[in-house]
């Protein structure tokens, strides 16, 4: 009787963990998987800090539970990536942030290896994740866009002012 209670309790804990993973996967704009084997505790702590600063959640779950959650959501394509020690970065606001942070960190820490991920339901392999990492953050893109709108208006205003000054000098 005592053994049955323990098994039931373990099952409840696992079901709760699968539900938690599913919720994070559903909520995330971008999910990036990385093999973290070989990172020191200090390196892992540094990576987690960088993730937090960018609003990215960085977690390690049992692969079997992550696979169950992915399958329940219909994310079959991502399940093959869960091999070995895998960490998951969940990007909720900026879909490029998890890829960018992990890619930059992997450049200096060769033991961290990008595996792939998922962006808005589409599976990305390692190369696509690296391409995503090259895209500037959302704020930078918006600033560039606004700057490109501002430049023609500024040039036009400069042109109008030059015409006005030319006419004034001709009248004088």
Swiss-Prot record:
GO terms for biological process: translation. One of its GO terms (molecular function) is large ribosomal subunit rRNA binding. It comes from the Bacteria. SUPFAM superfamilies: Ribosomal protein L10-like (SSF160369). GO terms for cellular component: ribonucleoprotein complex; ribosome. Keywords: Ribonucleoprotein, Ribosomal protein, RNA-binding, rRNA-binding. InterPro entries: Ribosomal_uL10 (IPR001790), Ribosomal_uL10-like_sf (IPR043141), Ribosomal_uL10_bac (IPR022973), Ribosomal_uL10_bac_type (IPR047865). The keyword Metal-binding does not apply. Belongs to the universal ribosomal protein uL10 family. Forms part of the ribosomal stalk, playing a central role in the interaction of the ribosome with GTP-bound translation factors. Part of the ribosomal stalk of the 50S ribosomal subunit. The N-terminus interacts with L11 and the large rRNA to form the base of the stalk. The C-terminus forms an elongated spine to which L12 dimers bind in a sequential fashion forming a multimeric L10(L12)X complex. This is Large ribosomal subunit protein uL10. The lineage of its organism: Bacteria, Bacillati, Bacillota, Clostridia, Eubacteriales. The gene is rplJ.
């Amino acid at each position: 009787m005592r053994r049955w209670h323990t098994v039931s309790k373990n099952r409840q804990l696992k079901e709760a963990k699968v539900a938690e993973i599913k919720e994070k996967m559903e909520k995330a704009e971008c999910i990036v998987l990385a093999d973290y084997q070989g990172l020191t505790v200090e390196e892992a702590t540094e990576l987690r800090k960088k993730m937090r600063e960018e609003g990215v959640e960085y977690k390690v779950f049992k692969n079997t539970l992550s696979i169950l959650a992915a399958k329940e959501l219909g994310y079959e394509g991502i399940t093959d990536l869960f091999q070995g020690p895998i960490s998951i970065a969940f990007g909720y606001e900026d879909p490029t942030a998890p890829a960018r942070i992990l890619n930059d960190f992997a450049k200096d820490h060769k033991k961290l290896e990008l595996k792939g991920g998922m962006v808005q339901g589409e599976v990305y392999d390692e190369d696509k994740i690296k391409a995503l990492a090259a895209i500037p953050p959302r704020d930078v893109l918006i600033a560039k866009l606004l700057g490109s709108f501002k430049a023609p208006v500024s040039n036009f205003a400069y042109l109008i002012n030059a015409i006005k000054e030319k006419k004034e000098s001709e009248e004088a």
